[in-house]
UniProtKB/Swiss-Prot annotation:
CC cofactor note: Binds 2 Mg(2+) ions per subunit.
Documented EC number(s): 2.7.6.1
Pathway involvement of the protein, from the record: Metabolic intermediate biosynthesis; 5-phospho-alpha-D-ribose 1-diphosphate biosynthesis; 5-phospho-alpha-D-ribose 1-diphosphate from D-ribose 5-phosphate (route I): step 1/1
Binding site for Mg(2+) 1: H131
SMART domains xrefs: Pribosyltran_N (SM01400)
GO cellular component, one term: ribose phosphate diphosphokinase complex
Active-site residues (renumbered): K194
Full protein name: Ribose-phosphate pyrophosphokinase
Source organism: Marinomonas sp. (strain MWYL1)
GO biological process: 5-phosphoribose 1-diphosphate biosynthetic process; purine nucleotide biosynthetic process; ribonucleoside monophosphate biosynthetic process
Lineage of source species: Bacteria, Pseudomonadati, Pseudomonadota, Gammaproteobacteria, Oceanospirillales
Family: Belongs to the ribose-phosphate pyrophosphokinase family. Class I subfamily.
Catalytic activity: D-ribose 5-phosphate + ATP = 5-phospho-alpha-D-ribose 1-diphosphate + AMP + H(+)
GO MF entry, a single one: ribose phosphate diphosphokinase activity
Length: 315
């Protein structure tokens, strides 16, 4: 741990401060800004020669600026002779562009970003709840994907809810929801089959499972515009659910997400701090945020000490 140093860009400095506080370290001294023409500029203001350096930087909105900050800072650290550079990317942007759909003339941007990260000399990536596990295969360097499930599960159990049914908001999330339900003493599982007529729009088609009188817990990796969760909450209430909660790792909350949530029948949306909340989101009474800092700090410590990450999750 004596060689460990942690730096951050402008994407999520508060999470970085929480992580270093738990590690008992100061945040690395770096200047990250822009030139007058909006190009990213980075200067490392202390000695990093021979150090094991971690950069905490989500690639959330503004995605391009935050990605370039990560890339440029990694280059600066390598040129300053850091022994190892690990990119800690709590929210990995561009992850939803992970395959070619509808047309052959589209990029696989998740692969492009993975190549950029590898090419700049980053040695390892540490991220949280990747949108698709197969993205790890896009990298030619080790990728550790840690999970927010222990944090979300602990919070749900502390709330003392009874008669819980875990709900997957779409067919693609069934594996995640089933795993969550299993950890809740094999809670009941329901599935919403939806069709998406166009990007960021969801239409409820069919509910599989009994939710009458239940506390329904929607589980997903992210909340973007909130359309899927709000439509799911409406369908669940129409089928007799007593209460509808949503637990999502990444609060993307783009577009009219806050307005959608405020106008929905969703009782509560619980998210983590992989992405900082806007003031509008902080003021929304239905949104509550938990911190991933304990899990992230332990993951950083384990990587630094060459210990198992999977052991954190009982594997």
């Amino acid at each position: 741990m004596s060689k460990l140093m942690v730096f951050t860009g402008n994407a999520n400095p508060e999470l970085a401060r929480r992580v270093v506080r738990r590690l008992g370290l100061p945040i690395g001294n770096a200047t990250v800004g822009k030139f007058s023409d909006s190009e990213i500029t980075v200067e490392i203001n202390e000695n990093v020669r021979g150090k094991d350096v971690f950069i905490i930087q989500s690639t959330c909105a503004p995605s391009n600026d935050n990605l370039m900050e990560l890339i440029v800072m990694a280059d600066a650290l390598r040129r300053a002779s850091a022994t190892r550079v690990t990119a800690v990317i709590p929210y990995f942007g561009y992850a939803r562009q992970d395959r070619r759909v509808r047309s052959a003339r589209v990029p696989i941007t998740a692969k492009v970003v993975a190549d950029m990260i590898s090419a700049v000399g980053i040695n390892r990536v540490l991220t949280v709840d990747l949108h698709a596990d197969q993205i790890q295969g896009f990298f030619d360097i080790p990728v550790d994907n840690v999970y927010a499930t222990p944090l979300l599960l602990d919070d749900l159990q502390r709330q003392g809810h009874e008669n819980i049914t875990v709900v997957s908001p779409d067919v693609g999330g069934v594996v995640r929801a089933r795993a969550f339900a299993k950890l809740l003493d094999d809670a009941d599982l329901a599935i919403i089959d939806k069709r998406r007529p166009r990007a960021n729009e969801a239409q409820i088609m069919h509910l599989i499972g009994d939710v009458e009188g239940k506390t329904c817990v929607l589980v997903d990796d992210m909340c973007d515009t909130g359309g899927t969760l709000c439509a799911a909450a409406k369908a669940l209430k129409e089928h007799g659910a007593a209460k509808v909660l949503a637990y999502c790792t990444h609060p993307v909350l783009s577009g009219k997400a806050i307005e959608n949530i405020k106008n929905s029948v969703l009782d509560e949306l619980v998210v983590t701090d992989t992405i900082p909340l806007t003031q509008e989101a902080l003021n929304c009474p239905q949104i509550r945020q938990l911190s991933m800092s304990d899990i992230m700090a332990e993951a950083v410590r384990r990587v630094c000490n060459e210990e198992s990450i999977s052991a954190m999750f009982g594997a």
